[in-house]
A protein has these predicted regions:
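Extracellular/periplasmic, surface-exposed regions of secreted and cell-surface proteins
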Residues: 1-171, 316, 321-395
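Active-site-adjacent bridging/hinge elements
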Residues: 36-43, 90-93, 118, 215-223, ...
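Surface-exposed, low-complexity loop segments enriched in small/polar and acidic residues
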Residues: 95-109, 158-165, 173-178, 229, ...
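Glycine-rich, aromatic-lined ligand/substrate-binding cores of catalytic
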Residues: 234-268
Length: 395
């Protein structure tokens, strides 16, 4: 049995400032055709300005932890951390365009500030019951939240319900339209609702029967980008967790591993999410799209009215910004080791026969099975289920 307390504080630098290199050098570009007054040369345009004063991002890190081991069987580890990142490399957002340089050509600067905090917990229990039986179980849980304190972001006008898109929010926070479920299902079901939408929607496209109803958050009688609000979370999971275990009985062994995430969201707008992406991709929940007949019959509706092109329903909203929380059985394996007495006669030291599976079960919050919550893009190769049979022989 032992107990260990840990604490640390440090100031560190981060030189991983993105893929763009040589930000301290100004660029110029040529083009635009031949100009006679320049001796038939080409025009020279100012490109991105360099910043010779760039430096590393600085992070102030704190960590406090405790390690406990009891009776050589149970071990616990708990950590709490805080991090303040300063001089984060960002693009200026509050410089007026009338200064003469296109905003996209302004140099990057060390001005951003981001805070992180969270905790991690891990527990392991090992037990040998007798000479034949033993088992191990292990679990972990982590919570992490980041907040962008300063990103030199220009404040939007006062008639925007939410005047910032970065400042005060987590990195990658999703914004979109909130669906109005006050009529029971959140769709335009009646001619009266359609007439109102036609008079108020300025989101791009023309609303139709079966499209989403949006909430006029600033109550100005118009549905437009001023009504966009933070939706769910960012793509970075706030919670990650997992648990695993193994059991041994005589010559048999069994193991499993589960992992999952929670409080993570992503905007899906490509293959599998919409019915018209990449010349058409009909998915499972499109079978339960809104139609007048389905609505009149009181059937379950899981998707807005189908179309051949993006409309008002395909804007960022709390339908297409999906909760990608999931719990997945990453691996499970059963094995048997043949008795050594049978093998020595043929010169074999050990033989183990096994069967295992990967990604066999997934529990997720999404309403469609076509999109996998672990994929970074709709075009990535999908996560596959696999079952393997094998034999390990040692001579």
């Amino acid at each position: 049995t032992n107990l260990k307390l840990r604490a640390s504080y440090g100031k560190v630098g981060n030189d991983k400032l993105g893929a763009t290199r040589f930000l301290y050098i100004s660029n110029i570009s040529t083009g635009g055709g031949v100009i006679p007054s320049l001796g038939r040369g080409q025009a020279i345009n100012q490109g991105k300005l360099g910043n010779p004063n760039l430096g590393w991002e600085i992070a102030y890190k704190q960590n406090y932890g405790i390690d406990v081991q009891l009776f050589r069987e149970l071990s616990l580890t708990v950590d709490y951390f805080r991090e303040k990142r300063e001089d984060v490399l960002i693009s200026r957002g509050t410089v007026p365009e009338i200064q003469g340089v296109a905003l996209g050509n302004l140099p990057k600067v060390n001005m951003g500030r981001i805070d992180n905090h969270g905790f991690e917990f891990e527990a392991t229990y090992n037990k040998r019951i007798d000479k034949d039986w033993s088992f191990t179980v292990k679990g972990n849980f982590a919570y992490n939240k980041n907040t962008q304190r300063f990103m030199d972001e220009a404040q939007k006008p006062a008639d925007y319900v939410y005047r910032y898109r970065s400042t005060g929010y987590s990195i990658g926070q999703n914004f979109g339209y909130r669906i109005d479920y006050s009529n029971g299902n959140g769709y335009i079901n009646t001619q009266e609702e359609l007439d109102k939408a036609l008079a108020t929607y300025q989101v791009g496209g023309t609303p139709r029967m079966g499209d989403f109803l949006y909430v006029d958050l600033n109550e100005d009688g118009i549905i437009d980008e001023k009504d966009q609000a933070p939706i769910k979370y960012s793509d970075i999971p706030r919670i990650t967790y997992g648990f695993s275990g193994s059991v041994n009985w005589k010559n048999f062994d069994f193991s499993f591993l589960f992992s999952g995430i929670a409080k993570a969201s992503r905007l899906y707008a490509g293959w599998g999410a919409t019915e018209f992406a990449n010349v058409g991709f009909f998915s499972d929940y499109h079978l339960q799209a809104w139609t007048p007949e389905r609505f009149a019959n009181g059937e379950e509706i899981l998707y807005p009215a189908l179309g051949s092109a993006p409309g008002t329903s395909q804007k960022p909203n709390d339908f297409f910004i999906m909760d990608r929380s999931f719990l997945r059985l990453k691996n499970i394996e059963l094995g048997y080791t043949l008795p050594k007495g049978l093998l020595k006669k043929v010169g074999i030291n050990s033989t183990r026969i096994y069967v295992n599976g990967n990604n066999l079960l997934t529990w997720k919050a999404m309403k469609t099975d076509v999109i996998d919550p672990e994929q970074g893009s709709d075009l990535n190769y999908p996560i596959t289920k696999m079952v393997n049979f094998g034999i390990n022989v040692t001579f």
